[in-house]
Amino acid sequence: MLAKLFGLGKKQQSASLAKERLQIIVAHQRNELHPRSSKISSHLLAELKDEIIEVVKKYVALSEDNIRDIDIKVEDSSKNSTIEVNIPFN
């Protein structure tokens, strides 16, 4: 009765609710980033491609045609996932 009166039970409920919400957020982020649990989102794939281009440009000259022809494939299997990147350059 006193716990109810002073709201002591609410703290446990709030903690449980916060924990549940945090678990949902973490699971959502894992699904977005982990290829085996879901496909990589097109936004994440585009961002990955842009970053790869910037790194490759540090070492190799790429023309606009080379950049346009970059091919990224994501393959999933039961054991692992792979990202294959093909970058044509002269």
Swiss-Prot record:
Give the matching Gene3D superfamilies. Cell division topological specificity factor MinE
SUPFAM superfamilies membership: Cell division protein MinE topological specificity domain (SSF55229)
One Pfam entry for this protein is MinE
Q: What UniProt keywords are attached to this protein's entry?
A: Cell cycle, Cell division
A GO BP entry is: cell division
> What InterPro entries does this protein map onto?
MinE, MinE_sf
**What is this protein's function?**
Prevents the cell division inhibition by proteins MinC and MinD at internal division sites while permitting inhibition at polar sites. This ensures cell division at the proper site by restricting the formation of a division septum at the midpoint of the long axis of the cell.
HAMAP family hit by this protein: MinE
Q: Which family is annotated?
A: Belongs to the MinE family.
Q: Which named protein is this?
A: Cell division topological specificity factor
Native species of this protein? Answer: Francisella philomiragia subsp. philomiragia (strain ATCC 25017 / CCUG 19701 / FSC 153 / O#319-036)
* Gene giving rise to this polypeptide: minE
